[in-house]
């Protein structure tokens, strides 16, 4: 894999969710913030992270820096995914289905942010079970990691690409 300078890339960053969390101490409550951040290049690479800090902007910045390090490649075919896939994490399940050109991104909240950051323009999605943003993001990314393109499937099966497509 080629290491790319993050300053060379035009990255799309989306804040999925911000939480205020409290630590109870002897003198009362200490508040801090956590931010779920998704980062992508809009061309098939996406990553996510959770940033935590005492201030919201700092939590977002930390999340962005960490998300850049977790980016991975998503196989795309004409701005959609190559096949249907189910991603699961905890009680959250996310169904991802390829869609024809012109359909758009049919997705809600957390899933939409990931699709836009990854550069997927036509897709149908459905969240099943838990709608918790943490688990939905992780389930969606797990589904995207399970995607395989035709060339890889052909190689794994020891066949030619045209045999797989037919």
From Swiss-Prot:
* GO biological-process terms attached to the record: translation
Q: Where is the S5 DRBM domain?
A: 11-74
Q: What are the record keywords, sorted?
A: Ribonucleoprotein, Ribosomal protein, RNA-binding, rRNA-binding
Q: What does this protein do?
A: With S4 and S12 plays an important role in translational accuracy. Located at the back of the 30S subunit body where it stabilizes the conformation of the head with respect to the body.
Q: Which InterPro entries match?
A: Ribosomal_Su5_D2-typ_SF, Ribosomal_uS5, Ribosomal_uS5_bac-type, Ribosomal_uS5_C, Ribosomal_uS5_N, Ribosomal_uS5_N_CS, Ribsml_uS5_D2-typ_fold_subgr
Supply the name of the protein: Small ribosomal subunit protein uS5
**Which PROSITE patterns does the annotation name?**
RIBOSOMAL_S5, S5_DSRBD
Q: Which GO terms describe its molecular function?
A: rRNA binding; structural constituent of ribosome
Offer a single GO CC term for the protein. Answer: small ribosomal subunit
Entries under Pfam families matching the protein: Ribosomal_S5 (PF00333), Ribosomal_S5_C (PF03719)
Q: List the gene name.
A: rpsE
Domain notes per entry: The N-terminal domain interacts with the head of the 30S subunit; the C-terminal domain interacts with the body and contacts protein S4. The interaction surface between S4 and S5 is involved in control of translational fidelity.
Q: How does it assemble?
A: Part of the 30S ribosomal subunit. Contacts proteins S4 and S8.
Q: Which family does it belong to?
A: Belongs to the universal ribosomal protein uS5 family.
* Origin: domain of life: Bacteria
- Residue runs in coiled coils: none
């Amino acid at each position: 894999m080629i290491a790319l300078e993050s300053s060379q890339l035009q990255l799309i960053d989306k804040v999925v969710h911000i939480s205020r969390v409290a630590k109870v101490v002897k003198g009362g409550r200490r508040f801090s913030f956590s931010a779920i951040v998704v980062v992508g290049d809009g061309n098939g690479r996406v990553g996510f992270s959770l940033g935590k800090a005492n201030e919201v902007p700092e939590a977002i910045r930390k999340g962005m820096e960490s998300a850049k390090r977790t980016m991975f490649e998503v196989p795309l075919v004409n701005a959609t995914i190559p096949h249907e896939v189910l991603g699961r994490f905890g009680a959250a399940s996310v169904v991802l289905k390829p869609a024809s050109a012109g359909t758009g991104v049919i997705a809600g909240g957390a899933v939409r942010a990931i699709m836009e950051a990854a550069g997927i323009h036509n897709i149908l999605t459905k969240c099943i079970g838990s709608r918790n943003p943490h688990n939905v993001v992780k389930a969606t990314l797990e589904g995207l990691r399970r995607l395989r393109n035709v060339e890889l499937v052909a190689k794994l099966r020891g066949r030619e690409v045209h045999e797989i497509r037919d």
